Amino acid sequence: MCTSQISDTLFDECQNGEKAWTSDEMKQAMTNYKKLFDDGVMQDGSLSSTSYSDGTTLFLAGQAGMMLLGSWWAQEYTGEDVSDAVANWDYDYFYLPAIEDGLSDSKAIGGVDFGYGITKNCKDPEAAWKAISSFAAGEGAQEIANDMNNHLSYPNIEPDTGVMVEREGLQSAVDEFNRSGKDIAAGLVNQRISEATIETAVQEAMQGLVGGTYSVDEAAQHIQDAQDAL
């Protein structure tokens, strides 16, 4: 999120070796990331391994003002037994506002979660292709849309409210999911790190930065050292 406020391509330029992790732009993004914690925007403990489950529980209990999640959160509505907060669906998503003057609001970020293919030794490639076609743009795709978990690459397939659980917040949840899909289709900033070594180094650097183990310069250098060692 913080890098996308500076440039849509900054993160990929760094992981592709086109720009140094120690560049002024990346250090600015890291400084702003730390600022979110220093200023209390991010709650203490939000980098822990339980932050996801704990955060959603607190949010639904009305004990947290907001949580950092993705468009797939709308799937919570489709459960059989949900809390009143989910059933009413009286909240919405937003993008992180610019942390400092001269920057842009955060962009939609993400990547491909699932991809399908047919192996060379597939015993029945025709049947496999039929299944993939359904998952991508047929009845299977419609079921995926109805679950409101993943956005489809194939356009114009939206949840069918006529077959979904009808609660007070149904239309609000579906509208939110559809709107986030349009945001993604309009342009997505990559969130994936292609090299596992770099992913680990980034995690270590950000943990150290927020925890006080690293300065911004040291955090940036930690990632750069991992990149240089490849």
Regions of interest found by a model, annotated:
Residues 52, 69-74, 112-114:
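Beta->alpha turn/N-cap motifs
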